[in-house]
Amino acid sequence: MPKPINVRVTTMDAELEFAIQPNTTGKQLFDQVVKTVGLREVWFFGLQYVDSKGYSTWLKLNKKVTQQDVKKENPLQFKFRAKFFPEDVSEELIQEITQRLFFLQVKEAILNDEIYCPPETAVLLASYAVQAKYGDYNKEIHKPGYLANDRLLPQRVLEQHKLTKEQWEERIQNWHEEHRGMLREDSMMEYLKIAQDLEMYGVNYFEIKNKKGTELWLGVDALGLNIYEHDDKLTPKIGFPWSEIRNISFNDKKFVIKPIDKKAPDFVFYAPRLRINKRILALCMGNHELYMRRRKPDTIEVQQMKAQAREEKHQKQLERAQLENEKKKREIAEKEKERIEREKEELMERLKQIEEQTIKAQKELEEQTRKALELDQERKRAKEEAERLEKERRAAEEAKSAIAKQAADQMKNQEQLAAELAEFTAKIALLEEAKKKKEEEATEWQHKAFAAQEDLEKTKEELKTVMSAPPPPPPPPVIPPTENEHDEHDENNAEASAELSNEGVMNHRSEEERVTETQKNERVKKQLQALSSELAQARDETKKTQNDVLHAENVKAGRDKYKTLRQIRQGNTKQRIDEFEAM
């Protein structure tokens, strides 16, 4: 029994380990990976490995894994990556797993500066990445510093601007807030729709020379072959769509492209190494096949996948709508609960006030009762005093009578009696005056007593009214809410050729009519322009890269990816090949 070989495959978001047999082919391993991750759009992907010379190479599916120059490690290391890119992500990427893998791979390429991205666009893309990771912005959860541990912008962008982490976060957060209600998978798609308009997106660059020996770049992508000057990977100078090419071949380091136009000469260039020509051939065949497939009606399998994806998306939208509805109900119930609590507090406060008023009224009643008793006692004292004075007056009257009688009897002592009489008369007058005053005082105390009695009765009535008033109603109860392979050929083969068929193709150069995503959205376009102006104020001009300068020139000239594409394909094939030879 042959000993199994351990293999580790790293996807963009997972690490898979398998044990394979010595006779396992590249396709068998590839099939095992896509089955494990649940991927059906297999034509975009491949398995990448580092060979014994340190070069990054794609695993050939039609050969045994052990017959290929994989660096000897235990386990054998492979990366599962997108090898071919779609023309339009929103039309071609069907499954959510495919969208996520592309999103993660493109995001990594932008952050590593393998794809040049201008600063303002990098901020917009970062906000979509944040929405995809965190969902809707919530100031209660996403406190200042919530993005501190996230790698969201290329290091080049951070180093070129005199902005703090907090200032970058603020700019990303502003756009994050605008994405409210956007599903996480839709955020990934919006990211890719913006990213696919970047000039270096989906391009495989190869160093080549023309017959003159001029060093140039060959760009192979989903739309065709483009030629770049050696110091400018952003703006291609000549372009050949796949629909103009009928045959591609190489012999050692010489690569020959035969156009469909029989009048046009062969398009010839030279690569520094044979292995590069093998890679170019494999990428040309794969991209051409996908280019043709897109321009033909969908296969039954693709139609089924699209229908299933639509159904899954519809189901997610329904679930989201239901969650939003439940969330709103919960918020309404919370607000209602808060309102009831508030009203309850208000009623308790009112009840407290009534109790305080009652206690105050009771105290006033007690005070008035005390005063009434005091007044009554004063009245009694005044009455008793008046009675005493009356007795004294009578006694004086009697004494007066006795003295008068005595005066009559004793004429002898008339002077003495007259003096006594005068004295008693004066005393009587004083007593009369005192009696009168005491009677007035008694009357006054009588009035005060009546007034106090009336106040007492009135207070008793008020207290009776307060005590008999119905208690405040209890708060109502809170009701909870219801809640594809292309063999790069054997390493020993120094030549190879492939015919590229263009039969049955509809509207084969539709890509030339495209506009960028920001051109479609005026609001985003203006926001990007405003942010670009704002960032220019904080930019350190001494740290500008060659790509920054080239990008600024393109913006100034009004060029974008698709305008450039139309321009570099102008004229017939012969004219463009002649132009290439003259470079």
Swiss-Prot record:
Pfam family, one: ERM_C
Residue span(s) of domain FERM: 5-295
Modified residues (N6-succinyllysine): 83
Binding site for a 1,2-diacyl-sn-glycero-3-phospho-(1D-myo-inositol): 60-63, 278
Classification via InterPro entries: Band_41_domain, ERM, ERM_C_dom, ERM_FERM_C, ERM_helical, Ez/rad/moesin-like, FERM/acyl-CoA-bd_prot_sf, FERM_2
Free-text activity regulation comment from the record: A head-to-tail association, of the N-terminal and C-terminal halves results in a closed conformation (inactive form) which is incapable of actin or membrane-binding.
Modified residues (Phosphothreonine): 564
Annotated GO CC locations: adherens junction; apical part of cell; apical plasma membrane; cell periphery; cell tip; cleavage furrow; cortical actin cytoskeleton; extracellular exosome
CDD domains: FERM_B-lobe, FERM_C_ERM, FERM_F1_ERM
Gene3D superfamilies assigned: 1.20.5.450, 1.20.80.10, 6.10.360.10, Phosphatidylinositol 3-kinase Catalytic Subunit, Chain A, domain 1, Pleckstrin-homology domain (PH domain)/Phosphotyrosine-binding domain (PTB)
Leader sequence segment: none
Main location (coarse class): membrane
Keywords: Actin capping, Actin-binding, Cell membrane, Cell projection, Cytoplasm, Cytoskeleton, Deafness, Disease variant, Membrane, Non-syndromic deafness, Phosphoprotein
Domain notes: The N-terminal domain interacts with the C-terminal domain of LAYN. An interdomain interaction between its N-terminal and C-terminal domains inhibits its ability to bind LAYN. In the presence of acidic phospholipids, the interdomain interaction is inhibited and this enhances binding to LAYN.
PANTHER family associated with the record: MERLIN/MOESIN/EZRIN/RADIXIN
Function (record text): Probably plays a crucial role in the binding of the barbed end of actin filaments to the plasma membrane.
Protein name: Radixin
Gene: RDX
